[in-house]
Amino acid sequence: YTLLSIPADGAQFLVVPEGAAVPTDVPDGVTVLRQPLQNLYLVSTSVMDLFLALDALDCIALSGTRAEGWYLDEARQAMLDGRIAYAGKYSAPDYEQILAANCGLAIENTMIYHTPEVKEQLERFGIPVLVERSSYESGPLARMEWIKFYGILLGKEELAQQVFDRQAERIAPLLDQQSTGKSCAFFSISANNLANVRKGGDYVARMIEMAGADYVFADLTDSGNSLSTMNLPLEDFYAGARDADFLIYNSTIEGVVSTTDELVAKCSLLADFKAVQNGHVWCVAQSFFQQSMEL
């Protein structure tokens, strides 16, 4: 038996081994999860990479993302092959399909809190709901460490530890890397002309620091909510990032930009930026957010 807790929202889960009896004294508010966990409804896309690393794709029967929304080849192929079915997005799940699949657990992200009635309805149907928060971690290694959480759920603790240890070993040389003195901005431009940037405590900001650069918006704080990003007026973004040595465009929000000219066409102010003039502009692939186990 293992009791798992997600402190941010007070959720607790009692993992009961296969064949074991459920204790009679389980406190109210503790969700019982009986192993083996099967026929999962996976809504949180950042979790899929962890399941792939644990060789647990076959535990997932339902997806909250259509095949074309997956940038992980194995996940997309599983949907195209019919091994995983689309069961509706977080705000509009197909309850009938989920019940028919004998779903053992719904793994959501915090978007579900925008439609709490959906979470309540799933639970009324007897489907436990886990709201994962790996994307709120302040560093990439902490985000990867959630693999231990899922290793416990799936009865693959030893494998999860091995996978995590390998990743930690890969990252170790970066932790002692000296600063290059260079600065970097990570952003996207929204349709309503705002710059979406990561807050200073976000894992992406930490990745930039690990690579030896200074994140130009490191001083942006929580601002009263738990979101890892915030929108800035273009003039504020201009003031903070114009002199950055490198720009990294986040394609996972507004789509891929293939050339610097395309980027400047989205936001003409960028033509004045040092990184644009020096040819130091990059764009992350749309798979970036889903590749939780990569660095």
What do these predicted ranges mean?
Residues E137-Q162, D243-L295:
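Structured C-terminal subdomain patch of bacterial secreted/periplasmic proteins
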Residues L40, S46-D49, R66-G69, P93, ...:
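Solvent-exposed loop/turn segments at secondary-structure junctions
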Residues V204-S226, I248-S251, C283:
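His/Asp/Glu-enriched short active-site or ligand-binding loop at hydrolase and phosphoryl-transfer sites
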Residues R34, Y41, K89-P93, N109-P116, ...:
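Soluble non-cytosolic domains of exported or imported proteins
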Residues A92-C103, N231-D243:
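Short helices/loops that flank or line small-molecule/ion binding pockets
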Residues Q38, L57-C59, N102-G104, F125-L130, ...:
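Loop/turn elements at helix/coil->beta-strand transitions in domains of secreted/extracellular proteins
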Residues Y41-T45, D49-L52, L159-G212:
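Basic- and aromatic-lined ligand-binding clefts that recognize polyanionic substrates
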Residues S5-L99, L105-I112:
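A short, structured surface patch at a secondary-structure boundary
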